[in-house]
């Protein structure tokens, strides 16, 4: 069977969108549970859900207009999930939220686009740096946090 670029793009976009919807669904449920436990305010949870789902809806609109074989989808996934990830990371109550990047990196591998993965990796490292700087300015870094941040950078790089 020879390589068919149109088939590959359709297949990759469908798989990535399915995974993205599954991740967003899990995160929506998790943040809903967090609200129910009193860990987050309703406004925060609604903002998170909007930030999480609006890029997905926009991506499906693009797919409807341009077709499943379009090249724009991988960019909307990367940017959309990147915004969701940034919001979650920078507003998290825990240092473990950096792991939210792993599903998107796994999804992006389906595109077999090295430059896209490198750009995403650089974005992630910059976000981790921004997160550490913000926490340092707020004087919210403990010795345990320093170890956590070292582990985060080691995992990402």
Residue ranges of each PLM-predicted region?
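Short, Lys/Arg-rich, polar N-terminal cytosolic tail immediately upstream
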Residues: 1-10
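Secondary-structure junction/capping motif
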Residues: 2-3, 41, 91, 140
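Short alpha-helical segments used as structural interaction elements across diverse proteins
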Residues: 11-12, 71, 116
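Hydrophobic transmembrane alpha-helices and their membrane-interface boundaries in multi-pass
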Residues: 15-93, 100-107, 124-129
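Alpha-helical transmembrane segments and their interfaces in multipass membrane proteins
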Residues: 29-51, 110, 114-157
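Transmembrane helix interruption/hinge and helix-loop junction motifs
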Residues: 90-96, 112-115
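Alpha-helix N-cap/helix-start motif
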Residues: 97-98, 119
């Amino acid at each position: 069977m020879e390589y068919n670029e149109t088939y590959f793009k359709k297949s990759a976009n469908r798989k990535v969108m399915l995974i993205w919807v599954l991740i967003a669904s899990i995160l929506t449920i998790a943040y809903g549970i967090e609200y129910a436990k009193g860990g987050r305010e309703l406004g925060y949870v609604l903002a998170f859900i909007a930030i999480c789902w609006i890029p997905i809806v926009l991506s499906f609109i693009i797919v409807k207009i341009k077709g499943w074989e379009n090249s724009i989808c991988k960019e909307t996934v990367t940017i959309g999930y990147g915004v969701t990830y940034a919001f979650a990371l920078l507003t998290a109550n825990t240092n473990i939220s950096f792991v939210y990047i792993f599903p998107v990196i796994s999804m992006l591998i389906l595109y077999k686009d090295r430059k896209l993965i490198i750009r995403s990796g650089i974005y992630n490292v910059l976000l981790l740096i921004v997160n550490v700087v913000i926490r340092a300015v707020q004087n919210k870094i403990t010795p345990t946090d320093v170890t956590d941040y070292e582990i985060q950078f080691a995992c990402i790089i």
